[in-house]
Amino acid sequence: MMPFYFGIDPTYILVIIGIAISGAASAYVNSTFRKYDQVRSSKHVTGTQAAQYILQKEQINDVGVQQIAGDLTDNYNSGNKMLSLSEATAQSTSVAAIGVAAHECGHAVQDHTNYVPLRLRAAIVPVANIGSTISFPLILIGVLFSWNQTLINIGILAFSLALIFQLVTLPVEFNASRRALSILSCLLYTSPSPRD
């Protein structure tokens, strides 16, 4: 355990920094999506239509496309070969919606080509989900019960596992985005025209 300085354990500072970075990244993604959600695609296709076209063009015939509830809850599930698009993405003709749909198609292409980092990410998802779910409750309970260091340490370890998952995920996400940009530039879906 690290020593206390001025009554503060440096580990807590690292956790706070991690939370701040996570919050800032989430805010950036949301603001960028909102900005480009106001720009319509020149092709006037929805996110769902774009995804179906991309999958067909990439000759991926075993992946379904469905609409799900939520906002920016879009995901690709390699286990059931399902590309799920949130309501905001599925029905919108904005370049943001088409970009998100293409990004998720990038994950389907990764799966189709057996991209190793995607396989690694899929293998550690269960552990990371547990870590992100229990980390803050354990830290909070540890603090509430007279600074129970064992619970706090387990919470920090769980948070660390979730952070490691995010680090492993970055190359997968960047690769999916690169694939999406390549696909979109070939399909000419990104010629924007401002909405009225």
Q: Each PLM stretch: what is its role?
A:
Residues 51, 103, 176:
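Residue-level signature of catalytic and energy-coupling elements of molecular machines
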Residues 99-111:
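Active-site recognition of the HExxH zinc-binding catalytic motif
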Residues 127-187:
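Metalloprotease/metallohydrolase-associated module, dominated by Zn2+-dependent proteases
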Residues 68-82:
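Catalytic zinc-binding patch centered on the HExxH motif and its immediate surroundings
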Residues 1-8:
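Short, strongly hydrophobic alpha-helical membrane anchors
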Residues 87-98:
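Short pre-active-site segment immediately N-terminal to the catalytic Zn-binding motif
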Residues 39-56, 181-189:
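Membrane-cytosol interface motif
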Residues 189-196:
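Conserved small/polar residues in nucleotide/adenosyl-binding loops
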